[in-house]
């Protein structure tokens, strides 16, 4: 399944860009990338998955090849959840599978709770908890304020042209900010995340998008427990042992929120929940796609039933 096609889905602010592998007559699997990534992050994984599905990897608004939001409209997690619904409506999907990495898992998980009848399987690849870490309680208003101020600051400077840099400088800067990616994976994401101009490369992403905690729809633990009860999907959660455990990297050493999430899903979904730990870092699906495919493939086909495992 090495070949793919490109689609553009019209939306009120422009278009959502998608990469498609396989026949659209097959059961759909919608793939959601992580924060500031794009659909290319699934290029290494999808060719290794069962070929009797149609895989669509979308670029969230303001990412990759998708349109930026209209001026004045900030980026919040709820907006991305709405984009998933737009894609499902456009392709007339009554039910489909969601596969999300990192922040994409949070978006997919939120969608599966809001529209439980539409999601038959939910796959979370090193996704962070959907709820508010108690350590962040005093910071939540700061994040909201920071998002507004950042948006206003970017809008005030929009008349300035984007700074173009050489491909080498672009890659090095990207890798400096993404220590879990190697050179090849970094180049793969930048292929879709940059545009070539006379002076070099410029980033495609909307500069209004800042740190994920500024746009994350934090909910309480109580709300998360309540939302989990609405899930109708079978859920596979793959945790990279050297991956991320919190939306904010500063809290990564505290694994209690992740354990709470796993325990809640396990006690709520029972046999519909599978938890698998794999060796690797946050970009395990890019760095070691064969490891992830070995877990995701059987789950998609309903061939493997496990409640907990470590590979």
From Swiss-Prot:
Q: What is its EC number?
A: 3.1.-.-
State the Gene Ontology terms under molecular function.
hydrolase activity
Q: Which domain of life is it from?
A: Eukaryota
Record has 4Fe-4S as a keyword: no
* Domain AB hydrolase-1 span(s) in chain numbering: 27-227
* Residue list for modification Phosphoserine: 210
| EC class of the enzyme, as a word | hydrolase
Q: Which UniProt keywords apply?
A: Cytoplasm, Hydrolase, Peroxisome, Phosphoprotein
For this record, an example GO cellular component is:
cytoplasmic vesicle
Q: Which InterPro entries match?
A: AB_hydrolase_1, AB_hydrolase_fold, AB_hydrolase_sf
Inducing stimuli? Induced by passive stretch of skeletal muscle.
Instruction: Tell me the tissue specificity.
Output: Ubiquitous. High protein expression in skeletal and cardiac muscle.
Where found, per UniProt?
Cytoplasm, Perinuclear region; Peroxisome
Name of the featured protein: Serine hydrolase-like protein
Query: What is the source species?
Result: Mus musculus (Mouse)
Coiled-coil annotation reads: none
Q: Where is the active site?
A: 102
